């Protein structure tokens, strides 16, 4: 299900648009205020959310009209939303349990349940401000007893049909490995946190979750790797790129395969990936095989001899600073290069230009966090920079993925050679 996050000033307009198409979910209704802030504070800044409302719709990504898909004033959020009735039933069960523990009457205002969340089977991932009232804080401080907390979260787990529950917190900006260092497990066995390079046994013992987006299976170990559901629209856009079929692609920040898999599904001959987090590489490997795509992992210092058609995905477990040397030895170049690193991918720009195919209609997709007032100006600067580095004429198309914080957006600049 797709929900529209829009400015309050445009709420009536977009609600009418959705209602006229019989896509508005009346049983859920428009969401705003503290509930909206509580649910999405791990994706957007609170000050930004206070100016917005969320309009729930019955749209799927596949049937979104192009005018909505391309509208820069809408932030599209993909999720499963529970019905209000389910929330009420769960709330009653939780209040009854807390009341029995405290031996007193309690209220929903004191002990609200997380009403919106994301499920990645078998994990329920809650927003940062879940259980944020002073009463909840005092309850967890006073009843640190494992049995009491387990009894409480048993109720949630049964209601949501999950075996694990955790609170999601933002990825530290300076962590280049993009690890969920602040993930807070609440319920279920997440395994022992491993420092250093993991072994095959460590991979086998770890807790893994999964989901499907655009028909593509993805998996990851939530203690060690992140998953960004906010990129689903950009992943869908990649599926429709021109000049992918039977081409060589480079993904210099592969992660668990966010964009890699879209290129493969779109018909790329081989996608060459770089990733420094071994847990992300293992996640990418597992999901590729589940999707039926051949994959080969190359560690730093190992040789790789490229043969056309051998593997759909080749992952180098090393820094992308070695990408130019690898491509030179293989005597190949890339038609599309994905630079999916935030807040900026600038450190890899030079590498990208060195491995790009020197023909018309070659592309570098540059991901950046940009202040809203600077988006167009920065587009010209990025295009000029790449044109100089490539010594070729280029054009730049600007694509807004989502709001990153107030007045800052995740932008993808498509640089194309002409």
UniProtKB/Swiss-Prot annotation:
Q: Spell out the family assignment given in the record's similarity comment.
A: Belongs to the class I-like SAM-binding methyltransferase superfamily. TRM5/TYW2 family.
Give the top-level enzyme category: transferase
Task: Give the transmembrane ranges.
Answer: none
Q: Does the keyword tRNA processing apply?
A: yes
EC number annotated for this UniProt entry: 2.5.1.114
What Gene3D superfamilies does this protein's entry cite? Vaccinia Virus protein VP39
Chain residues that bind S-adenosyl-L-methionine:
228, 235, 275-276, 302-303
Question: In the UniProt record, what gene is named as encoding this protein?
Answer: trm12
MF terms from GO for this chain are: S-adenosylmethionine-dependent methyltransferase activity; tRNA 4-demethylwyosine alpha-amino-alpha-carboxypropyltransferase activity; tRNA methyltransferase activity
All disulfide bonds of the chain are none
> Record's Gene Ontology CC terms?
cytoplasm; cytosol; nucleus
Q: Which InterPro entries match?
A: MeTrfase_TRM5/TYW2, SAM-dependent_MTases_sf, TRM5-TYW2-like_MTfase, tRNA_wybutosine_synth_prot_2
What protein is this chain from?
Answer: tRNA wybutosine-synthesizing protein 2
Q: Which UniProt keywords apply?
A: Cytoplasm, Nucleus, S-adenosyl-L-methionine, Transferase, tRNA processing
Its annotated compartments are: Cytoplasm; Nucleus
């Amino acid at each position: 299900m797709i929900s529209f996050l829009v400015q309050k000033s445009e709420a009536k307009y977009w609600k009418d648009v959705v209602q006229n198409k019989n896509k508005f979910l009346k049983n859920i209704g428009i969401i705003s205020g503290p509930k909206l802030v509580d649910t999405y504070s791990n994706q957007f800044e609170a000050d930004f959310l206070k100016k917005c409302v969320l309009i729930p719709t019955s749209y799927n990504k596949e049937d979104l009209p192009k005018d909505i898909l391309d509208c820069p004033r809408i932030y599209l959020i993909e999720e499963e939303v529970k019905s209000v009735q389910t929330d009420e039933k769960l709330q009653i069960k939780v209040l009854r349990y807390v009341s029995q523990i405290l031996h007193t009457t309690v209220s929903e205002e004191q002990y609200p349940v997380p009403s919106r969340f994301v499920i990645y089977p078998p994990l329920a991932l809650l927003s940062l401000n879940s259980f944020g009232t002073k009463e909840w804080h005092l309850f967890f401080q006073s009843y640190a007893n494992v049995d009491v907390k387990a009894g409480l979260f048993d109720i949630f787990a049964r209601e949501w049909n999950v075996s694990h529950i955790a609170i999601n917190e933002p990825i530290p900006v300076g962590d280049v490995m993009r690890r969920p260092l602040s993930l807070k497990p609440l319920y279920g066995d997440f395994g022992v946190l491993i420092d250093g390079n993991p072994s095959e046994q460590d991979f086998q013992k770890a807790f893994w979750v999964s989901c499907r987006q655009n028909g593509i299976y993805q998996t990851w170990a939530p203690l060690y790797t992140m998953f960004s559901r906010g990129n689903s629209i950009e992943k869908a856009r990649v599926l429709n790129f021109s000049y992918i079929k039977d081409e060589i692609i480079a993904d210099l920040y592969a992660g668990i395969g966010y964009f890699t898999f879209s290129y493969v599904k779109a018909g790329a001959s081989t996608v060459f990936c770089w990733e420094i987090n071994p847990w992300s590489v293992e996640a990418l490997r597992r999901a590729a095989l589940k999707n039926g795509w051949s994959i080969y992992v190359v560690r730093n210092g190992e040789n790789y001899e490229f043969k056309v058609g051998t593997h759909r995905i080749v992952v180098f477990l090393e820094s992308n600073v070695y990408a130019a040397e690898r491509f030179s030895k293989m005597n190949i170049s890339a038609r599309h290069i994905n630079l999916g690193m935030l807040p900026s991918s600038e450190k890899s720009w030079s590498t990208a230009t060195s491995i790009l195919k020197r023909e018309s209609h070659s592309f570098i997709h540059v991901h950046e966090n940009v202040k809203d007032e600077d988006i167009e100006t920065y587009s010209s600067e990025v295009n000029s920079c790449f044109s100089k580095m490539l010594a070729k004429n280029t054009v730049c198309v600007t694509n807004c993925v989502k709001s990153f914080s107030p007045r800052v957006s995740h932008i993808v600049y498509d640089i194309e050679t002409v």
